[in-house]
Amino acid sequence: SFRNSYVLDAGRGGIQETNDRALANMQKNGTYSVVPRIPAGEIPAKKLAVIAAVADEFNLYVKITGAQRIGMFGARLEQLPYIWERLVDAGFESGQAYGKSLRNVKSCLGSTWCRYGVQDSVGMAVELENRYRGLRSPHKFKFGVSGCNRGCAEAQGKDVGLIATTNGWNLYLGGNGGANPAHGRLFVKDASSEEVV
């Protein structure tokens, strides 16, 4: 199985960029945004309360991102260690919202909640994000997992996309939602969950 070292492992600090070292993304006014990892956009109420408390304590602007995460904006560089201490103590880690690595795995509600879902897209997205988080790459990359062919997670517009079928998952590669939008190309049809992970 393919594995890569986690971006925050000991001894890897020398290859980090400024934003990587700060575990935050510098904004245009010189402050930073802090974006903890929230696999598949799932967050327990207790963790949500921690984000609210941190944002309140440090007077941060809070925004739900297009990547189904919660961004906190306006942090000063000297505040970052204290912010991350609170977040790490609550079980969060960096969402690498700034690095050349896996940004996120976006998911729809899937078969757990949606009447159209034919596979557990949330469970698959959590598994993929936990499996590939911190993976370094030449450029940022994103996954999308849709629980049916309605495509609510925009899976075909991601670098790697999965769309559930009644027999498994269709795997799409090479999608792009940026300046030159493109649908990914179908790579594998009806793959099992084990095959796509």
Residue ranges and their predicted role:
Residues S1-P44:
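N-terminal basic/disordered segments at the start of proteins
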Residues L8, V34-T166:
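Small-residue-enriched alpha-helical segments and adjacent helix-cap loops
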Residues K142, G147, G151, Q156-V197:
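Mobile "lid/hinge" segments at catalytic clefts and subdomain interfaces of large enzymes
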